Amino acid sequence: MKKVLVFGAAGAVGIHTVKYLLSEGKYEITILDLKNKNSFSRLKRFKKRVNVLYGDVTDRVLMEALVKDHDYIIYLASAMPPLGNMKSGLSMTIDYGGCENIVRAINYYNPKCHLFFASTTSMYKNIKNPSVKSRITLNEFDYFDASKLESEKLIKSKLKNYTIYRIPLVLSNPLEETFMYHGNRDDDMDVITKEDCAYAFVRGINYAAVLNKQTFNLKTDTINYGELLDKLLLINGLSSKYLLSRIFLEKDYY
C-alpha cells in the first residue's frame, strides 16, 4: 500500500484532500497541521482512519522523520495573505522554509518520493491569459508570492519527482474557513472550488509519472471579484471575514 503524507491538512483544500484520499481506499495516509483548537476540531474526525499528527513544517528533524517513509507528499501548508504579506520573513519562514526542509529530506532520505506542491497564480498579477511560461515580475512587498516562486525554483533545481499546481482564488465557506479574499473589485479572477482543487491533488497521484517535472495552472471558472463579494454578503450576511475582504480590497489575491 502506497503511503501519502499531507501537510496543511486542516485547511479548506486539505480537508477535502484527505476525504478524497480515503475514498480511493488504497493509501496509508498521514496528515499534519499545527495544533490549535481549529485544526484539532477539524481533524479529529479522521483519527480512526488516518495517522493524525500535529507539528510544524519548519521543524527539520520532524520533516526528516516523516519524509523518509512516504511515497507521495502533498504540501498545502502556507502563511496565507494577508498575514503572509504583513511581514517580510513570515512567508519565507513557513512557505519557503518548510518547503526547503522537505526538499532536503527527500534528497537525503527518499529521492523517489513525489512532491505535489501548492503554489499560487497571484504571482501573475495583471497578466492577461497567463501561462506557466509567463514572465513573473514582483515588487518588494510581494512576500507571499516571492516565497512561492522561490520554493518553485528550489523544487525544480533539487528534486527528480515533483508536480507544481499554481492555485487561483479558492472558493470556500467564509463563515467556517479562511477566505482567500485579496483582489480589486473590478478584477476578473480565475477561481476553483476547494473540492476541485483537492481532487486535482489526489488524482494527480495516479498520473504522477505523466505529470512529473511539470507546472500547471488550476482553474474551473472566471468570476468578477466584486460580484463574488456581493453574493457572499447576500448568502452569508455580514461577517468579520467579509469585512476583511473589503478592507484589503485593493491588495493582490491568493
Task: Indicate residue ranges for each PLM-predicted region.
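Mid/C-terminal beta-alpha module of Rossmann-like enzyme folds, strongest
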Residues: 203-254
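Glycine/proline-rich active-site loop of Rossmann-fold NAD(P)-dependent oxidoreductases
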Residues: 149, 172-182, 194-195, 204-216
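NAD(P)H-binding glycine-rich loop region in Rossmannoid oxidoreductase-like domains
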Residues: 51-97
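N-terminal Rossmann NAD(P)H-binding glycine-rich loop of SDR-like oxidoreductase domains
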Residues: 4-24
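Conserved Rossmann-fold NAD(P)-dependent oxidoreductase catalytic core, especially the SDR/UDP-sugar
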Residues: 100-143
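Active-site Tyr-X1-5-Lys
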Residues: 126, 139-163
